Amino acid sequence: MQKLAELYRGKAKTVYTTEDPDLLILTFRNDTSALDGQRIEQFDRKGMINNNFNYFIMTKLAEAGIPTQIVRLLSDNEMLVKKLAMVPVECVVRNRAAGSLVKRLGVEEGLVLDPPLFDLFLKNDAMHDPMINESYCTTFGWVSEPHLARMKQLTYQANDVLSKIFDDAGLILVDFKLEFGLFNGEIVLGDEFSPDGSRLWDKTTLDKMDKDRFRQNLGGVIEAYEEVAKRIGVTLD
């Protein structure tokens, strides 16, 4: 599949068109960002790790009946995907308190959330991805009520699948975000799942094994990503 024009360049991925109008090439770069892209550093192997990590997770979710945009791996850092009309809303599930929830409510980090919380955020870096609710989505026309309900259902289903995968690997899935789009009128899971967009803690030590290591200057970012990948069975080079 030939890579043509650059369609979109995000904080850590670049999207290219192909000769097929329904297919895109997703390229994972070594960039790592924080503070809505204000702080950016590069880490060797990160693009390769996240590409293979994402393919592994998306394959597991597809096997569980969740429609995803993946088609196939093209290289260490490239993947062929379906072209989705992306919904500008992020879905977040929180199994434990961390990040913005702790800051907003003053609850203890690590507090078990049962049942898990479901949050929505508008994708807008300039506005720091503001938290919204379901009525905002329909009133402003970001996504229809039926499609939003489907996104919520698939996010919870993904949480069930992924929580078990990580638990079996000695890890806690603290929280994560998912993004969806439309393909032929149907809601499909897009973007990525990796330690960039999730929080993963070691079950025994509670060590952070995700991008919080970068955000909080803990060091060992790539080592943590590789360890998580190894534990769940992701094949790296």
Swiss-Prot record:
Enzyme Commission no: 6.3.2.6
Name of the protein described by the UniProt record: Phosphoribosylaminoimidazole-succinocarboxamide synthase
Keyword Ligase listed: yes
UniProt cross-references to PANTHER family, sorted A to Z: MULTIFUNCTIONAL PROTEIN ADE2 (PTHR43599), SI:DKEY-6E2.2 (PTHR43599:SF3)
Gene Ontology annotations for the cellular component aspect, listed alphabetically: cytosol
Catalytic function, reaction form: 5-amino-1-(5-phospho-D-ribosyl)imidazole-4-carboxylate + L-aspartate + ATP = (2S)-2-[5-amino-1-(5-phospho-beta-D-ribosyl)imidazole-4-carboxamido]succinate + ADP + phosphate + 2 H(+)
InterPro entries the UniProt entry points to: SAICAR_synt/ADE2_N, SAICAR_synt_PurC, SAICAR_synth, SAICAR_synthetase, SAICAR_synthetase_CS
This protein's pathway: Purine metabolism; IMP biosynthesis via de novo pathway; 5-amino-1-(5-phospho-D-ribosyl)imidazole-4-carboxamide from 5-amino-1-(5-phospho-D-ribosyl)imidazole-4-carboxylate: step 1/2
Keywords, in A-Z order: ATP-binding, Ligase, Nucleotide-binding, Purine biosynthesis
Top EC class of this enzyme: ligase
MF terms in GO: ATP binding; phosphoribosylaminoimidazolesuccinocarboxamide synthase activity
Similarity remark: Belongs to the SAICAR synthetase family.
Gene name tied to this protein: purC
Pfam family, one: SAICAR_synt
Organism, as annotated: Sodalis glossinidius (strain morsitans)
Gene3D superfamilies: ATP-grasp fold, B domain, Phosphorylase Kinase, domain 1
Gene Ontology process terms (BP): 'de novo' IMP biosynthetic process; cobalamin biosynthetic process
Domain of life: Bacteria
